[in-house]
Amino acid sequence: MNKIEELTDDTFKSEVLESNIPAVVDFWAPWCGPCRMVAPVLEATAQKMNGRLKFYKLNTDENLNTAQEYGIMAIPSLLVFKNGQEVDRIIGFMPQEQLEEKLQNLVETPQEN
């Protein structure tokens, strides 16, 4: 089982940018209705991906620096990182099947050196 971990401005670099495992970061806020709709989709997707991707949540209200650094203007925003680089950005809600297909393609793409 792959759970979704909370990130902060302090842990973002070590957990996401320095990881060898691709990561999905959900930029969200507690007051955001669509963010609450994304949460169960991410949880189910994380379980299906079975450790091939790391899944994180970053509360934009509490971690403004990282949100500003990545130009987060709307939430929910899902940023996908591979080899320390942002490789995809999904803004708003995406159905689970669509999200899984998109992430599966990322996992199957060979690592670039």
Predicted feature residues:
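Conserved Rossmann-like nucleotide-binding pocket used by diverse enzymes
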Residues: K3, T8, W28, K54-Y56
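Structural microenvironment flanking redox-active thiols in thiol-disulfide oxidoreductases
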Residues: T60-A67
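Short pre-active-site segment immediately N-terminal to redox-active cysteine/selenocysteine motifs
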Residues: N20-I21, F27-W31, A74
